[in-house]
Amino acid sequence: MRAFVTGGGGFIGLALARRLRERGDAVRTLVRTRTRADALDEIGCELVEGDLSSTQKLAEQMAGCDAAFHVAGVYRVGIPPSVRPAMYEANVTGTTNVLDAATAAGIPRTVAVSTINAFGNTAGRVVDETYRRPEPPEYVSFYDETKHLAHLDAEARAAAGARVVIVQPGQVYGPADHSAIGGLVRQAAAGTLRALTFPDLGLNMVHVDDVASGICLAHDRGGLGESYVLVARSRPSAS
């Protein structure tokens, strides 16, 4: 299989690229610049420079691929209003452009990486893929809003016949995680975590390598139009 991967230089995207290469797949990955793609180059990925702004360009870059994996996105919380347009372009418009490009390029199957954040705050209720966020949605961050909108777009396209499978990872952790959550995990492991801001918070953690395997399974065995939650068996508490 020849796979097209967006966000291959990111935390989840790199793990996915590694997993695909380990099982013998050819990987063409979209990067903003080759100067920061050494890890992808080392594992034998084909690098193409670009971004998510042009559907036509993306379709051209996908030509000849058998599958597409849309992993790219911006993950930040507590951002100033000035950063919101860029996040919207990456997370919402970028998803629209990738899915349109995959259709135009005739990709047999595209896996869109969403998040369990699309469910919103379930107030302790354990839900599955059939759950729908109450309307009107109450967003806890602009990131939350953009990922929910992107998820709805992917669902709508799948319902209209697009060859899309959606995955929804939980809180992902693992090596090279430079997010705020990654920092908290490292502090907790080192015994240096001094404050618990949300002592009643429950997080369903999942290792990045398991997410990469789950994404591959969604492509190989998942039903078109279906969503698959990717989480661990346990639900550890922040307390």
Role assignments for model-derived ranges:
Residues 186-195, 201-235:
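Alpha-helical substrate-binding/gating segment
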